[in-house]
Amino acid sequence: MTDILDVDFCRSQFPLLAQAEADAYFESAGGSYVPQQVIDAMSHFMSDSQTQPEWPFAAAKRGKARIEKAQKGIAALFNISPDELVIGPSTTLNAYVLSHALRPGMADGDAIVVTNQDHEANGGCWRRLADTEIEVREWRIDPTTGDLDPADLTPLLADGKVRLVAFPHVSNIVGSVNDVAAITRIAHQAGAMVVVDGVAAVAHTLPDLAALDVDFYMFSFYKLYGPHLAMLYGKKARIDAVANQNHFFHDGNGAAMLNPGGTNYESAGA
């Protein structure tokens, strides 16, 4: 028996679609509507536990418990540890912070690889490192297919100077799906880490980040019916080695070093 999608039920989950002037919204690459359940969860957090979650009183404890529950749930979805997870405001900002956190670990004259298949979020922040004596190498798509050929990556890595390769899991420009595991192996064999933009991928597939062996992976929750938040995954050893971008007292404090200002409580708690 073929299952039939209950369109009316699906529409009823999204209050914005109930507006008389609601437009058809066919721009899933830009984001998604938010269902009532998310709206209710955010509202409940603000009315029940909107306070600093580290305090010892009851409302703070409830808020902290909700945030930690959400972090554990997200970590389980991607097969990672909660202490390898940063929840920040957007992938663009997470990538920007990461670029500043990784630069001190590179030497002048080191190289990084970027692509012309990526969203600006995972391109511009790395290209700007050229202003700090980092060589930026371009891994370009095949102009006839739009694909990135891993064979074209190998010569870019041949001299051993490349410290980082930034590329998308799925390109929101041409729609190509990249073999993340294979590209990661090539980069690792050359001594480079990888930073993968998964924003256009996670709405269609749920990657096992441990199995992919990526060093860093980024995704935005508002592409998948969530609030305007984004996750940055990093292997614990990689996170522990970054330069702190947060308050001085977070130096050495794991993922907090990549989250200046902290997480938006009501959104993360939803």
Residue ranges and their predicted role:
Residues M1-A270:
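Pyridoxal 5′-phosphate
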